[in-house]
């Protein structure tokens, strides 16, 4: 048995300490503080690999600072069951509300228009002239023979396809075959209304399915890449077509009318979210400052940038304003409480080599670090945070005590000393995968309007997803729906990154509570999925909620007639008693297994360890290290 765990190995291991089950009052219903309707299992993480946290959230866990918790939805005392919700961004279909949010935001940035209905009265002479010119051009184009235009369009699209990072590796003969088969065709009259005048089949890629599978590339991804690059690099008005993803591996070409052309020529480029998916470009714009740009000079400057998690005076002041006005919290906030909730993170960071490591990792200090004794003394009781993103907020006494035990020593200062810069992340599930910019780990996104900080998004970037932790904003800009806009921005980031890192395609929105009205907004990002907490299978949102009735708050979502139902009722430990010996323990400089513990201590420890095994599952039982302080 290996009794000593070397530091190099320890630096890539997850160290946790389970605290068991606890109950607390619920923030999502009117049950009252006396009713303990929220039942969870919790543990503290000193350090946690991004892959291990990905596995945890795929079993219903979430984090609040360094505290990890998993709601027990099946407990009869649970009043508001919480289900993990995620969106596959490759299939994202913007709703009417999503589109309205972007339009409203763009109107303000471009024209300083706050109400959409005012836009019709703000047209300038220049706008009218442009409209006239466009109508004239459209008429002339319609009188032309389209052959030359379509051939040029076809060539431009083939060039985009061949520039795909994966396709670019094809030999010249295969590229020639692609060129010969990727031909735009005229649709029949009965199909024009549904599919547009022209279409392009990508069926030729079925010939290369083995190569695609080998590199985890799908035909859908190639189509999405083509549409994205076309919209990004080619002026649609040159061709008068919109490209849309069709059925059976096709791209459809639909004519643009004059009002659409005018709208496209003046719209902001801040968000480029695609309907029906996006594996998107290989660029990662959010790692650098993203500025709104248009053909006309915008009335406002809008920027998004990613930073290390920090508690500056500017950030903390915005947080206090948000909590007071939006959540009606009049109690005084402290920096130390804010740090424990939204700055401290157990995730071991992997920073992209193109980024400055110091720019993105929290070093235990802050730019305005006068985090004086007053903060530490006053923070014996943590703040109540009622989170829009429904994260656990440290608002029950057990969690306050547990989290406070860990804030003093290792987490703030050592977690980033063991992180590193790397172009890749080695994972058990996918092997070696690329590192996105800025990296894997926990980050803050700053939203600035004319230089003023108006929003902060707290996010975790993991091997398969961007997980939204919390978002707070300046209530003075409530009219911009910044909460909704930030979600769309995060979805777009995932869409772009997934083009070069295919498995990183999900957007996690925390928990969904069907009985809670303020959770309904999460249903606006479709097609989303809910996690079945008995099988850990993802189920399409509408199908999942069909099992939830007013008199049935909790339900299993996934059913398989071929499965052994009796076996499902067994716990992980009952199925695999040998897992007890697979648990790795660590105390001081020693690592050991259950059989190495004295019989007396085994008797004291056994029930706690079995409970832990049943909550983290077989794979994490073997990976996490049960850490005794």
From Swiss-Prot:
Catalytic activity: an N-terminal L-alpha-aminoacyl-[protein] + L-arginyl-tRNA(Arg) = an N-terminal L-arginyl-L-aminoacyl-[protein] + tRNA(Arg) + H(+)
Short name of any one Pfam family annotated for the protein: ATE_C
Highest taxon listed in the record's lineage: Eukaryota
EC number(s) given by UniProt: 2.3.2.8
Compositional bias annotation for Acidic residues: 356-396
One GO process term, biological-process aspect: cell migration
SUPFAM superfamilies xrefs: Acyl-CoA N-acyltransferases (Nat) (SSF55729)
Cellular component terms per the entry's GO annotation: cytoplasm; cytosol; nucleus; pseudopodium
Keywords: Acyltransferase, Transferase, Ubl conjugation pathway
Composition bias, Low complexity: 282-295
An example molecular function term from Gene Ontology annotations: arginyl-tRNA--protein transferase activity
Region entry Disordered, spans: 274-298, 353-405
Keyword Chloroplast in annotation: no
Functional summary from the UniProt entry: Involved in the post-translational conjugation of arginine to the N-terminal aspartate or glutamate of a protein. This arginylation is required for degradation of the protein via the ubiquitin pathway. Does not arginylate cysteine residues.
Family named by the database record: Belongs to the R-transferase family.
Protein name: Arginyl-tRNA--protein transferase 1
Organism from which the protein derives: Dictyostelium discoideum
Lineage of the species this protein comes from: Eukaryota, Amoebozoa, Evosea, Eumycetozoa, Dictyostelia
